[in-house]
């Protein structure tokens, strides 16, 4: 943690601190372990590889600008629970990089959002059954999620549930590819690592990602 006064004086030190905090937490929970981590939030997902210990980045940048400060070796992709699904010019289902964000959020939040998101796809498929109440202000609605995804289903000529599954598959493939980049393309076998998730949407995708990468352990 950092005090408000220190944060004001050294604001640059807060850059990418959220993803770094999750990575440090995973390493402390499972010290000296081989881990692949993914932090899936509303707009993006951060992935990293820990081979016994956390690796500092040799260089880092934010929005194309170099950061002249210490950073961890993280890779970020534009896929999160709020990523918006759409039909591209070729008539195919696509996902992101646009996001519904925290406000108005996914359609299923019933806070004014109307665009179909990854979270809405989970709601349509019943993945939140028994856990629909997020707070006093947010009650998840599978009906609202279905209304948002239905136009995509009609455009694709597919059942609603298949369209929802397709949205989730797209999100999974984006994250799986990012995990392959930090492992296979660097000479590591994912099967030698445990997949560890955090972030609001991480648990919804953990097992599917582990299976697609041939990983035997998921936390």
Spans of model-derived segments:
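N-terminally biased helix-coil "hinge/interface" segments that flank
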Residues: 1-219
């Amino acid at each position: 943690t950092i005090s408000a006064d220190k944060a004001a004086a050294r604001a640059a030190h807060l850059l990418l601190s959220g993803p770094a905090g999750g990575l440090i937490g995973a390493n402390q929970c499972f010290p000296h372990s081989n881990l692949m981590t993914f932090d899936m939030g509303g707009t993006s997902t951060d992935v990293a590889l820990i081979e016994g210990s956390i690796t500092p980045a040799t260089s880092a940048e934010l929005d194309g600008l170099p950061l002249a400060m210490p950073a961890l070796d993280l890779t970020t992709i534009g896929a999160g629970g709020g990523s918006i699904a759409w039909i591209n010019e070729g008539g195919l289902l696509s996902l992101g990089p646009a996001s519904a964000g925290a406000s108005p959020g996914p359609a299923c939040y019933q806070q004014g959002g109307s665009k179909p998101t990854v979270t809405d796809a989970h709601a349509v498929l019943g993945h939140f059954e028994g856990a629909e109440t997020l707070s006093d202000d947010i009650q998840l609605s599978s009906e609202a999620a279905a209304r948002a995804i239905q136009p995509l289903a009609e455009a694709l000529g597919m059942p609603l549930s298949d369209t929802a599954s397709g949205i989730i598959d797209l999100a999974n493939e984006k994250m799986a590819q990012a995990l392959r980049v930090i492992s296979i393309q660097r000479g590591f076998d994912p099967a030698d690592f445990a997949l560890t998730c955090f972030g609001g949407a991480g648990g919804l995708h953990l097992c599917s990602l582990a299976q697609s990468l041939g990983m035997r352990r998921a936390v």
